[in-house]
């Protein structure tokens, strides 16, 4: 995703009444990295540094580094995938074989799940419960919809995601990615869900 494409994307999103603030500065990006342990892949970084989407549902990163309430909101978004997993462990018998035998008590289950999730690629919140994989740190990572362990692809990459979420139509010259990149753990959860459905 280049600057021209980002500018066009922002223009189309504004036509859908998405509000934007001035883009994040290099200093703000560094603070986000320091406060939340997030390194934005370059396509997302380019978008956020060009103009920052601030409509309801979007992550207001600037607010998150300038207020305790904003920081808590971002931490809640970052913890959403774990909280959803824990809900399914407690209420829906979710457990992965590779984690070993499932302990009988929830406190032990929670500890194992937390430890296992910290080993996986970090998910960066974009909008509502949509997340971009932070790994690998490169352009073109898929966007996931995460609701408990009901995880699906919501975009093969960032551009594809915005067309799906907001019904915008990008010029054909932008090109498309035919299938999403495989992301350790998260893509496996989608495959697992598909097996259950089949």
Predicted segments, located by residue:
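A surface-exposed partner-binding patch
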Residues: 1-117, 124, 128
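Residues that flank catalytic or metal-binding motifs in active/ligand-binding sites
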Residues: 120-122, 140
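Glycine-rich, aromatic-bearing surface loops/beta-hairpins
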Residues: 137-195
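Extended serine/threonine-enriched, polar tracts that run as long, contiguous segments within proteins
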Residues: 129-133
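A short secondary-structure junction signal
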Residues: 108-112, 134-142
């Amino acid at each position: 995703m280049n600057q021209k494409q980002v500018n066009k994307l922002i223009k189309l999103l504004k036509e859908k009444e998405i509000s934007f603030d001035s883009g994040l500065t290099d200093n703000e990006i560094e603070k986000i990295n320091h406060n939340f342990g997030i390194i934005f892949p370059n396509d997302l970084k380019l978008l956020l540094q060009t103009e920052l989407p601030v409509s309801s549902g979007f992550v207001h990163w600037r607010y998150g580094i300038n207020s305790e309430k904003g920081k808590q909101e971002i931490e809640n978004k970052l913890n959403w995938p774990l909280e959803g997993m824990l809900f399914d462990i407690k209420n829906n018998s979710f457990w992965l074989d590779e984690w070993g035998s499932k302990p009988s008590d929830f406190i032990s289950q929670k500890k194992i799940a937390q430890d296992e999730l910290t080993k996986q690629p970090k998910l960066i919140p974009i909008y509502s419960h949509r997340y971009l994989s932070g790994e690998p740190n490169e352009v073109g990572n898929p966007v996931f919809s995460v609701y408990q362990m009901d995880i699906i692809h919501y975009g093969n990459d960032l551009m594809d995601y915005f067309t799906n979420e907001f019904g915008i139509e990008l010029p054909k010259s932008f090109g498309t990615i035919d299938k999403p990149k495989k992301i350790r753990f998260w893509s496996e959860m989608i495959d697992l869900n598909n097996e259950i459905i089949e």
